[in-house]
């Protein structure tokens, strides 16, 4: 119930990953982002920055949950998304489909030894940006599946950003 309105609908089938990858140039890949507000914000940022699709790995919250839809300003209903197959330590195998479709897989990390994000993105045609849960970030399984580990430069004394904020910055770059 929202402002006196109730709606019920059947979920449309998710698009096939292969179909998404045929035309996409930029995709977001989310691992363990379990907060519905962060999911909604990431979809809103992705839509605003021209990301073509969002791929959901293990532990990602349901983008069609009421709070996610609301925070996204409805963009979860417009932006294609698909769940990657597999469990907590096996979903990363689905990333091979992105590599096979000529995507460069970039993982966001606060690690000071990672490449500067702008440098990592320079000259790339097709990008899959992986972001992980707030706090733990991406698992080592996910990090190993990527081509480049990239960081967002931050002021001294700041060690991390909210996952939706970090995603927005990476989509803008």
Per-region residue spans from a language model:
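Structured adenosyl-cofactor binding patch, chiefly the S-adenosyl-L-methionine
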Residues: 7, 45-49, 60-80, 140-173
């Amino acid at each position: 119930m929202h402002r006196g309105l109730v709606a019920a609908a059947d979920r449309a089938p998710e698009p096939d990953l292969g179909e998404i990858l045929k035309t996409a140039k930029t995709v977001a890949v989310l691992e363990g982002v379990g907060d519905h507000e962060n999911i909604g914000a990431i979809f809103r940022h992705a839509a605003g920055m021209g990301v073509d699709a969002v791929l959901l790995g293990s532990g990602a919250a349901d983008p069609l949950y009421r709070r996610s839809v609301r925070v996204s300003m409805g963009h979860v209903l417009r932006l294609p998304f698909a769940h990657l197959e597999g469990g907590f330590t096996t979903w990363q195998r689905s990333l091979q489909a992105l590599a096979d479709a000529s995507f460069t897989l970039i993982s966001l990390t606060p690690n000071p030894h990672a490449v500067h994000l702008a440098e990592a993105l320079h000259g790339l045609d097709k990008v899959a940006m992986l972001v992980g849960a707030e706090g733990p970030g991406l698992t080592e399984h996910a990090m190993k599946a990527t081509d480049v580990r990239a960081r967002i430069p931050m002021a001294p004394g700041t060690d991390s950003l909210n996952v939706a904020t970090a995603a927005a910055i990476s989509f803008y770059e």
